[in-house]
Amino acid sequence: EQVFQEAEVIFVGVKPYQICPLLEEYQGILDQRSNLLLVSMAAGLELEKMADVIQNDQVGLIRIMPNTPVAIGQGVISLARSQAVTDQQVAKVNQLLSGAGALYEIEEKLMDPATAVAGCGPAFVYQMIEAMTDAGVGLGLTREQALQMAAQTFQGTSQMVLETGEHPARLRDAVCSPGGSTIAGVNRLEQVGLRGDIIAGVEAAYKRTQEMVQEAAKK
């Protein structure tokens, strides 16, 4: 109760179906608050639904969706805000989360796509690192050698994209010498449909995210 009475920023980290009952429990306090910011980490729970419970335009509402690399300060955090939230409040949240990774403010309607790309993305990358590791072991590297090489390759390659600002296709082309090993591997990956499979995986994650939102709304 004291938290809802005195805090300027409250992070709410419960299940989506638990948030509205929680807000209803403290509605008497929330009715009297101004300059309060509630930050929800519940997937799929729309800001409008929380606003309908609180019924106080002076309470700012923010949705965030972090991914697991926030645990080592290298995460992606998607953020959407209600109209009552000021730029100063967003800056405050950014400051509080600065040690967790990069924060990207987006429209609320894009939260589910962002979840599919960034929230689910680490699992897809782990699969690719694992596959490259297994390939290296099959070619004679020790598992430790192959794993370290594959993981470092992903890290360095990602940093190249971020620091150069170049399109990934241009950076890929720079690695592919005519008639060389790399272009042979790239062509084979195109033949087996790697690009399409990754796109399909992200789309499947997005579809399931929307299904979970609908399931939570029924609870």
Model-based region annotation:
Residues 151-219:
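NAD(P)-dependent Rossmann-like dehydrogenase/reductase catalytic/cofactor-binding core
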Residues 18, 46-49, 92, 124, ...:
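Hydrophobic alpha-helical segments typical of transmembrane helices
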Residues 62, 111-116, 168-173:
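Short pre-catalytic strand/loop immediately N-terminal to key active-site residues, enriched for Gly-Thr
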Residues 3, 19, 50, 142-149, ...:
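Small-residue helix-packing motif on alpha-helices
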Residues 49-60, 76-113, 125-163, 208:
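Internal alpha-helical scaffold of NAD(P)-dependent oxidoreductase catalytic cores
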Residues 1-79, 83:
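Rossmann-like NAD(P)(H) cofactor-binding subdomain of soluble oxidoreductases
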Residues 121:
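Aromatic-residue-lined binding/catalytic grooves and analogous aromatic/hydrophobic interfacial grooves
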Residues 43-45, 66-70, 118, 152-154, ...:
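Glycine-rich beta-alpha junction loops
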